[in-house]
Structure formats: structure tokens, C-alpha cells
Amino acid sequence: MAAINVKALKGEKGYSTLERNSCRPSFDICGIWGGYTGEGSKTVLPSKAYAKVSCRLVPHQNHAVISQLFVDYIQSIAPEYVQVKVTPMHGGEGYVCPITLPAYQAAEKGFAKAFGKKPLAVRRGGSIPIISDFEQILGIKTVLMGFGLESDAIHSPNENFSLDISVSYTHL
């Protein structure tokens, strides 16, 4: 924890930090703003405030139901003198690629051939909503296999990807 400069990690009881960070549902506040946002301070109360949030869903959670539960909850806790407007955007169902799937096992063999070792099966939350549609509508499972490294800093300002790895995975 010293590497990320925190004293302790908290979260859902009964689950490890790895589980909470990868395969459990999450609610994330992506941004909050309102009132004066320039440099310096102001003693003005904002007339409006905004927030952007997202949720990681897991299998058997319906994005429309979860979205409505969120809207209902926010409206239920808002004081009567506060106007609340919640605008649901888009969503998709949760999906897990079974590692027992023949297509996964074939990809695993190709990975081992290209990289000299089997991939580590790790569940990671992500947003590819059409994957669950493939299963529900077309009746097919989709293999999801990442080729990046932790050092790639995916979705960060310093995101990068190794050219050596990208060339290696073309041999799968």
C-alpha cells in the first residue's frame, strides 16, 4: 500500500481487495462539479451541481433495473426543495468468459505458443456491452483475452502498449 500512498483499503466486507476491484459490482463517481470552478476561492453557493457516475455490473444484473434503482434512490434522498434530474446514458449486461470454453482453451494454447507460457486467467471489469448481446441474441460466447501489461497504464494519461507484445500476439 505504500506504493499508492494509502494506509488502508476498505470495501465490501467478505471480499478481498482483488475481488472488489475485479469481479464485484462497483459504483464509481467519475466527476463532480458546480458553482465557481476557477482559481481562488469564492463565498458563493452554487445554484447547480453535477456528477457523472458509472457502475460495473456483473452477470445477472440488468443495466436498466440498476439504473432505475439508482434514479429512485437519488430522488428518495433529495430534500423536497432540491430539484434532481438524473439522465441514464447507456449500459450493458455483465459477462464472464468461461475458461472451460473450448474457444478459450484454443486461444490459451495459441497464447502459450506465442509467448512461451499460458496466460493468467484474471477477471477484470470492463465495458464492452455488445459482448452480452452476442450471448443473449446470437447464442455465442466471446473470448476476451488481454495482451497488455500492468505497466501499460490502460486508460490513464500515460497509456502505452508494447510494440513487441503487439507483434507477438499477431502470431496467435
Feature names for model-found ranges:
Residues M1-N160, D164:
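Metal-dependent amide/peptide-bond hydrolase catalytic core
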Residues T170-H171:
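Conserved small/polar residues in nucleotide/adenosyl-binding loops
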